[in-house]
């Protein structure tokens, strides 16, 4: 893939808070635009220019992301080991969460591929949907609030992202430590089983 107008049109994003670095709360990122004509690129740059630039720490972080230690640098070995450990840990956390979600009644979850989140789909019982509607609440919000109240686990209801009507999802981060993930999946499993039993049709 090249950068000419005849190439595939693609806009790619990366940020330090949502990359494998996991620097949550830090603000810094980039956008790469390829395969668009000059007029489209000009408009994209115009819109991007309306935003304030990252603060100094965000700019420093992006500089480090774009220019990490290289073979031969004094810090390369420790950088590579830490990076590899982070990637392995994230992979194991994601796998544990996906396996747990897929083992639960009415829940399906695709494998996480390069994201810091998983998006399980939940088939909620009609009684749960009715209880949510009685509270003038979306069913996935109802589920997420019950989860938070029961376990302290916070997830983001899928309805904030838009979803096919009549389907329910939530977003769950995989950035916790491996030790915490084991506790989270245990609590989540216990909550979900009790929730499904309480609202069984």
Task: Please describe what each predicted stretch is.
Residues 1-201:
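PLP-dependent class I/II
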């Amino acid at each position: 893939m090249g950068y000419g107008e005849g190439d595939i049109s693609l806009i790619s994003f990366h940020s330090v808070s949502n990359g494998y670095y996991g620097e949550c709360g830090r603000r810094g990122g980039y956008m790469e635009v390829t395969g668009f004509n000059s007029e489209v690129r000009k408009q994209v740059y115009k819109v991007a220019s309306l935003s304030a630039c990252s603060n100094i720490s965000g700019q420093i972080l992006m500089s480090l992301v774009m220019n990490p230690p290289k073979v031969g640098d004094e810090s390369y070995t420790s950088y590579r080991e830490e990076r590899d450990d982070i990637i392995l840990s994230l992979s194991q956390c994601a796998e544990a969460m996906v396996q747990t979600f897929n083992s639960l009644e009415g829940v399906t979850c695709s494998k996480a591929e390069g994201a810091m989140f998983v998006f399980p789909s939940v088939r909620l019982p009609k009684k749960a949907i009715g209880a949510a509607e009685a509270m003038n609440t979306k069913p996935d919000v109802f589920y997420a609030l019950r989860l938070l109240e029961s376990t302290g686990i916070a997830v983001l209801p899928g309805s904030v992202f838009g979803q096919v009507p009549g389907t329910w999802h939530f977003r769950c981060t995989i950035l916790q430590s491996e030790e915490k993930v084991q506790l989270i999946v245990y609590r989540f499993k216990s909550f979900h089983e009790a929730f499904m039993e309480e609202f069984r049709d």
